[in-house]
Swiss-Prot record:
HAMAP family: RsxE_RnfE. It comes from Sodalis glossinidius (strain morsitans). It is a multi-pass membrane protein. Belongs to the NqrDE/RnfAE family. This is Ion-translocating oxidoreductase complex subunit E. One of its GO terms (biological process) is electron transport chain. The complex is composed of six subunits: RnfA, RnfB, RnfC, RnfD, RnfE and RnfG.
Length: 232
């Protein structure tokens, strides 16, 4: 398995930042009330991860170990500010919906963790790919949880997609079933905790099934003291 494929597989599944490392749970639980909000924040976080990892990797030779963390935070804050202005300019409805959680990307453990653990020790191309894979893994988790909560809570899917993608995206709205009274448990943070719990269980079961399908490695035979060999 080459390095690029391993990085993608690690970020998307094996070492998923939300389902394995359990990082970034604050925005995961607070913003995933709709699929649109989840997708918007996930894409913003992915863009920040790619840009931050690339910048940290490119500057790693000139960043001394004693002051590396403050410099990483400054780089992350600069990128997040640029992304925030882009969302404000081109997706103002989404900007209002996400609110404080866009600037809070600066304090996201996923971003600073990848800058410290991976980007500071790898070339820019691999660092950018790592940021992309980690970001897409987090986005997929956000999107799945947001879609689950939106369907159970409001009976819709991608409601308000025009806030993210423009007026044409109104056609993406799907009404799975009609309801006059939203299911508040699914829309509130307790529903996010419950949904995340089911997703963790689902990933565990899938991993166990995949492990069971793998051929068992030959186990070495350990002879006890005094036990004769088979050919003796």
């Amino acid at each position: 398995m080459n390095e690029a494929k391993r990085i993608l597989l690690e970020g998307l599944w094996r070492n998923n930042s939300s389902l394995v490392q359990l990082l970034g749970l604050c925005p995961l639980l607070a913003v995933s009330n709709t699929a649109t909000n989840a997708l918007g924040l996930g894409l913003a976080t992915t863009l920040v991860l790619v840009c931050t990892n690339t910048a940290v990797s490119a500057l790693r030779r000139w960043i001394t170990g004693e002051i590396r963390i403050p410099i990483y935070v400054m780089i992350i804050a600069s990128v997040v500010s640029a992304v925030q202005m882009l969302i404000n300019a081109y997706a103002f409805g989404l900007y209002q919906s996400l609110g404080i959680f866009i600037p809070l990307i600066v304090t996201n453990c996923i971003v600073i963790g990848r800058a410290e653990a991976y980007a500071s020790q790898r070339p820019p191309a691999l660092a950018a790919l790592d940021g992309l894979s980690i970001g897409l893994g987090s986005t997929c988790t956000l999107l799945l949880l947001g879609a689950l909560r939106e369907v159970l809570g409001n009976g819709t899917l991608f409601d308000g997609a025009d806030q993210l993608l423009g007026a044409w995206a109104r056609v993406l709205r799907i009404e799975v079933f009609h309801t006059d009274t939203p299911f508040l448990l699914a829309m509130l943070p307790p529903g996010a905790f419950i949904g995340l719990g089911f997703m963790l269980v689902g990933k565990y079961l899938i991993d166990q099934r995949m492990k069971a399908r793998q051929p068992k490695a030959a186990r070495p035979v350990v002879l006890q003291q005094g036990q004769p060999l088979a050919d003796e």
